[in-house]
């Protein structure tokens, strides 16, 4: 075989090779969304960008308030909530008395301790320049809220073409209207048509571990950078799913312990990626089989263990609580019950 000269183009040979593979049926078609999916995809992606822009405006509003010495973020969990908006509107309109603005708080923020914290957080050097900046950021946030509400209505209208698939996805923990619409837009109502297994789909979404092995040494297994739109949505759904008592919450806690727990700062992030991978598999199977998801319960992993394994696990936990002591588990009948009869001796 002659060596190829440098600079020689191989396009013709590459095309011939591709044609041979296609003729033999060795090439599979790529995933091409339908026209209906593309419409929903345009809306869901624009909604994601609008939400990100809104978040950036909130951060700029935080910065403007902090530059004036106002520490609302240290008292309020969300400065764009009802109480936060009322106080910011009062600041923009020219109110400078801290106690008057603190009295605008609603709900639990009207408690005596919270009122004192709000008064301290609002006592600052807020000038007309800061008011102008806050007004601009507030108006942009309102525009984003209005745009997001309109997009939600349009997405719900177009995603209503797949009522059966929406009902199936709604049974998956962590899946709501936004996540289900994003799934239908990015992956489609029938993922098994394009992806023969959930593993292939996970690889396409880049929610599978990286396979980086060299000289029999396994290097970092971080996921890829693709799946820009559907991957963050599934991770967001995973954070919501682990808040509900069930198998996914139990699996998350087991994974955090396996990855090092509190000793490893990245244990929770690794575990949440694994939960997102599990959600992808569940959604794939739900749409493939047409059966809604049924949770196996928070004690799923405990039921798989024998009584001896459960006793050994409890003994190890007690040993960690009382180091240096010997832990012995004794099983006795409940009070008032007759003692167990001794086995009869053989004649």
Where are these regions (language model features)?
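A detector of single, family-specific signature residues
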Residues: 1-347
């Amino acid at each position: 075989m002659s060596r190829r000269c440098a600079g020689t183009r191989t396009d013709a040979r590459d095309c011939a090779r591709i044609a041979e593979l296609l003729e033999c049926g060795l090439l599979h078609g790529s995933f091409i969304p339908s026209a209906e999916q593309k419409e929903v995809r345009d809306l869901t992606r624009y909604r994601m960008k609008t939400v990100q822009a809104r978040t950036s405006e909130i951060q700029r509003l935080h910065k403007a308030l902090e530059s004036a010495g106002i520490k609302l973020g240290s008292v309020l969990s969300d400065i764009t909530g009802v109480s936060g908006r009322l106080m910011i509107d009062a600041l923009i309109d020219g109110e400078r008395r801290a106690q008057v603005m603190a009295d605008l708080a609603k709900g639990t923020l009207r408690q005596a301790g919270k009122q004192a914290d709000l008064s301290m957080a609002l006592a600052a050097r807020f000038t007309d320049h800061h008011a102008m900046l806050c007004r601009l950021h507030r108006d942009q946030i309102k525009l984003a809220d209005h745009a997001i509400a309109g997009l939600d209505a349009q997405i719900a209208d177009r995603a209503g073409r797949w009522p059966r698939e929406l009902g199936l996805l709604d049974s998956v923990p962590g899946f709501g209207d936004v996540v289900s619409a994003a799934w239908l837009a990015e992956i489609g109502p029938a993922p098994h048509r394009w992806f023969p297994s959930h593993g292939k789909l996970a690889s396409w979404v880049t929610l599978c571990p990286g396979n980086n092995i060299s000289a029999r040494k396994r290097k970092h297994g971080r996921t890829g950078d693709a799946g820009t739109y559907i991957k963050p949505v599934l991770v967001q759904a995973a954070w919501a799913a682990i808040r509900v008592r069930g198998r996914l919450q139990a699996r998350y806690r087991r994974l955090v312990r396996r990855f090092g727990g509190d000793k490893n700062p990245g244990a929770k992030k690794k575990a949440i990626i694994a939960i997102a991978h599990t959600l992808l598999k569940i959604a794939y199977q739900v749409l493939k089989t047409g059966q809604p998801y049924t949770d196996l319960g928070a004690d799923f992993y405990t039921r798989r263990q024998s009584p001896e394994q459960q006793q050994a696990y409890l003994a190890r936990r007690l040993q960690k609580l009382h180091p240096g002591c010997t832990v012995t588990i004794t099983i006795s009948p409940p009070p008032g019950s007759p003692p167990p009869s001794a086995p009869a001796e053989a004649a």
